[in-house]
């Protein structure tokens, strides 16, 4: 399936109940169980919802990802990614990233024991130099917000794999049209779907995509 077709068709199948070509919006909090402990794939909308599942399947497809999880905002997705870490862990973050990310790291997550070093991610040597024994994640944007710097993803993947560090990329500005970081070996891709993926300025949302089942299971 070509990319343009994926954008409009991936994850979308006729509704099994009515045959509707487009999926309905399921406005429900809970679901009837067939019996105790046995559901039809959904039990509570906070964990999953048929409408959201369609969105996630589509976003996974256009990122060439095995898994995608949608969130109520881009910052919710950012927070979920950092929650893969533990108190005492260290993050290397690009020094030109969305301000909400730096504020969250400096004003919220640092209170829970997460430390951060900011570096110019364009400089691979600077990233390598910043690595500590406790470093567990490298977080970068490419292009960056707002200066539109471009980071060498192949170099970042090499560094991350050598040190067994998670590599997360905010690819909001590029969109999957121009860049699919998972194809380079990145562990996690994040998008604020509020921006280009929505395109019409009427929704707020976020998504994390990955090819690693262990990461998906932990975030889900």
What role is predicted for each listed range?
Residues 30-79, 83-84, 100-107:
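Conserved N-terminal alpha-helix of the aminotransferase class I/II PLP-enzyme fold
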Residues 1-42:
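N-terminal glycine-rich, Lys/His-bearing helix-loop that initiates the first secondary-structure elements
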Residues 20-21, 53, 64, 202:
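Short, basic and Ser/Thr-rich N-terminal targeting/leader segments
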Residues 9-12, 49, 55, 152:
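Sequence-pattern detector for short linear motifs
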Residues 16-18, 44, 48, 120:
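Alpha-helix initiation/capping motif
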Residues 9, 69-220:
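Conserved PLP-enzyme active-site core in the AAT-like
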Residues 3-7, 57-61, 185-187, 191:
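Short, hydrophobic/aliphatic alpha-helical segments
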